[in-house]
Structure formats: C-alpha cells, structure tokens
Amino acid sequence: MPCLLVAGLGNPSAKYQNTRHNIGFMVLDFLSKELDFDFSFDKKFNAEVGAINIGPHKVFFLKPQTFMNLSGEAINPFVRYFDITHTFVIHDDIDIGFGDMRFKYGGSSGGHNGLKSIDSFMGDTYFRLRFGVGRSANKNVVEYVLSDFNAQEREQLEGLIAHAKEAVMSFCNMAQYPKEHILTHLQQYFTLKIPKLTPSQTQNNESFATQFSQMQYTRFTQG
C-alpha cells in the first residue's frame, strides 16, 4: 500500500500550543478528532505519529518533537523508513496575511527555520500548505510567531483549520496523480485569501460565525 506523510510543524511543550508557530500542530490535532485517530510518541523518530487508511493509501500524520528548528531530524528518517510517496508539510507563514492559504511544491524556505531543516536533510521536493499568520508592526519575528493568536484571530481559527483539513483530504485522495496535477488542484480549489474586516466590523466585534457566512473568499491560482 503506497504511503503518504502529512507533517504539521510546531514546537512541543504546552507553553507553545496556542502560538502562531504551532498552526501545523493545530491542524493535525483537528484532523485527529475529525478522522478519529490517535497520536502516540514514536521514540525512533522523536515524533508524535498517527495513521489511517484513506482510499488506496496509508496516511501517516506526524508532529516532530524536536522543536521547530530541527524538524528535518524527525521527518527525513520517517520518509526514508516508510518509503513515503508524497510528503505534505503544514506550516505558518508570516509573508501572507492571517488566514490566507497558499500551496506550493518545492522552492525556497522563505526563511522559515522548520523548512530550512527539512530542506537540509531531504531537499525541497515536498508539498506545502502555507498558513498565513501575517506580521506584527510592534514585535520582532521570533517574538511574534512564538506569541498566541489574539482574540479576534482565535474566533476565526476553527473555520480556517477546517478549510485546511479539507485541503489535506483532497491531497490524500488525489495522491495517485502526478504531482503537477495535485498542486494545480490544491491551488485552484483551496487557495484562500481572507477579505480584511472593515473598521465597523472590527469595532462591532462581529463573530466569525456571522462573518464566515457572509464572506466571499477569493480563490486564485498561483503563478
């Protein structure tokens, strides 16, 4: 049975669990609940690992316990040991707005230390879900990504993480096709650009449940 790997990046320890840098872990935790599988620690790979069958594939879900900057130390040996056909990495991205999602295969790490670590071990030949967290005007990058999502962002997270879950499922169901077809499909149907709230929406503190039903998400194909 062909094997796939979905890896979410983050830092272990409870103090990091709600931080922007841990969005990869958050998506995998949501998948665990929705798809009814459990994570268990695998000492061989220094990672939390879960697995289920989706269609013709065995799909592994992995949360490295190495800390972000050493993510490749867990992912690379896992990919080699199980002869993984395709790897899909979910990570935070400060270069796109909060909640925006983009997909790519290969290419630059964009300065993300978790991706740098993976690339140093196995190159850049893997799929990526770039989950936008935006930037801060007041905090440096490290302080910002290691801080918790704010209250307004937390209201939106559940719907956004659910969208990311659907993208993961689509990847798993299409994994038998050439990587170019998989990437085009993800970019066309799951790329997300969140309309920014107007000042009145922000002042009125509208719930995301209401906003979600009204928003017209803009999907676009990356060049």
UniProtKB/Swiss-Prot annotation:
Keywords of this entry: Cytoplasm, Hydrolase, RNA-binding, tRNA-binding
Location in or out of the cell: Cytoplasm
Matching InterPro entries: Pept_tRNA_hydro, Pept_tRNA_hydro_CS, Pept_tRNA_hydro_sf
Site (Discriminates between blocked and unblocked aminoacyl-tRNA): 11
Domain of life: Bacteria
GO biological process: protein quality control for misfolded or incompletely synthesized proteins; rescue of stalled ribosome
A GO cellular-component term linked to this record: cytoplasm
Family in the record: Belongs to the PTH family.
Organism field: Helicobacter hepaticus (strain ATCC 51449 / 3B1)
Assembly, per entry: Monomer.
Record Gene3D superfamilies: Peptidyl-tRNA hydrolase
Protein name: Peptidyl-tRNA hydrolase
EC number assigned by the record: 3.1.1.29
Catalysed transformations (reactions): an N-acyl-L-alpha-aminoacyl-tRNA + H2O = an N-acyl-L-amino acid + a tRNA + H(+)
Site (Stabilizes the basic form of H active site to accept a proton) residue list: 92
